Amino acid sequence: IELTYNSNHIEGSRLTHDQTRYIFETNTIGLTEEGVRVDDIIETATHFRCIDEIIESAKSQLSEKFIKHLHFILKTGTSDSKKDWFAVGDYKKLPNEVGGRETTLPEDVSAEMKKLLADYNSKENVALEDIIEFHVMFERIHPFQDGNGRVGRLIMFKECLKHGIVPFIIEDKIKMFYYRGLKEWNQEKGYLTDTCLSAQDTFKAYLDY
């Protein structure tokens, strides 16, 4: 619930924590006086299914097929999925940007993703910083038309599980530190690393509780 609520909120979902919990527990939204976007409901439900998928596949090697499958689960049934130019479960067809930064062009995404995965999967011992660095590179490629942040954070969670590292949730309240860390990675890796370590401490508190 925490992972889904926070990851979707970072991307603009307006659902409350209670509404998110209600979808998880009953697969319905419940009564609400506030207007709720249908996509917020769909993407909350599909994000829960993505979490099921990363838990079931935690020990498997990261691959293009798996990453595309996560995107397919996340975006199926959304308004985006009905657009001709939006590729559900496949790489982007149109250029996009994140935070004013240009990302990899559509025609170069496949090659860039293959290289990123080959470099990452060749590591004998994966540490937390390797997972964070993969995330930074993934977000800079921005391989999908939309949903990159959520898929990227799901990948981090999965890879932490795979390598025996305490996973973490980037909560909505620390998103500005998270975004700064992504932007400043080349100059100062400590910003994002410290943000993730702080989030890890919060997750440890959940486990202890």
Label each residue range with its predicted role.
Residues I1-Y209:
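FIC/Doc superfamily catalytic core
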